[in-house]
Amino acid sequence: MKTHRVLHKLFLMSLLTLLVWTPAHAVAQTEALTIAAANSLRDALRTLLPTFESQHPAVTVRVIYGPSQSLRKQIEEGAPVDVFLPSLAEEIDQLDKKGLIIQGTKHIYGGTSLVLITSPVLPAPVRTIEDLRSIPIRRIAVGDPKTSSVGKVAAQFLKFSKLDPTLKSQYVYGEHSRAVLDLVAKGEAEIGVVYRTDAITDSHVRILDTAPAESHSPIQYGVAIVWTARNISGAGDFIEFLLSSRTQEELKKYGFDQAQDKIGLVRRQEVKP
């Protein structure tokens, strides 16, 4: 009888432990969401992601930052990515041509402009883009068009403005936008050409002028779900969050223009591979 009571007590204690701990353990389970994002999105995502995660507690976000072209190549090579956030939507199109994007998930969530920057500590003798035609510049930092989208767009601008022949010998190339910012901030280049989204929150540089919109292809920030995505549900939730009016207002603080694509928010049924 004594043994029976002891076993009964142990059973009740085990049941109580199960009732207390199992729900908490279940709630603690989260699913990772891997995002490959352009370097120019660092500041914006640092603000936005905590909000997204608080709204979706079952999702834990992991971000891989880098130049858009490099991230695209990693995805082509099979990198485990759920969501692709390049700074030029055409990088998504390149993946789409290879069948690496889930149909119907590409959206344009914002745009920006191309700007001329200098260091506030060691300012360049120029004030506008037109000054580059007459005032000598020792070094001008631009993105490498082979590795970065900002380099491709800057090359278009310099060619359109007919500044390329004059300034080409003064170019200092940065692998990506952050590298261009660093070259200017450290005084290794007097002038730099970057996206407004890169420069607007960086206290180490100052915006001098904006390149005419017609001097380069539109700078459209896009998002899409990668074909091999493991967390499709979380990816769809993130795109809806990105296109929401509240997020759009927040993005303006980081140099983004209003989203051009607000139709057809991603729903779970639309993103099944």
Name each model-derived stretch:
Residues 1-6:
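N-terminal secretory signal peptides that target proteins for export/translocation
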Residues 8-9, 165:
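Short hydrophobic/aromatic segments of transmembrane alpha-helices and their interfaces
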Residues 27-56, 60-65, 69, 73-79, ...:
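Exported/periplasmic ABC-transporter solute-binding proteins
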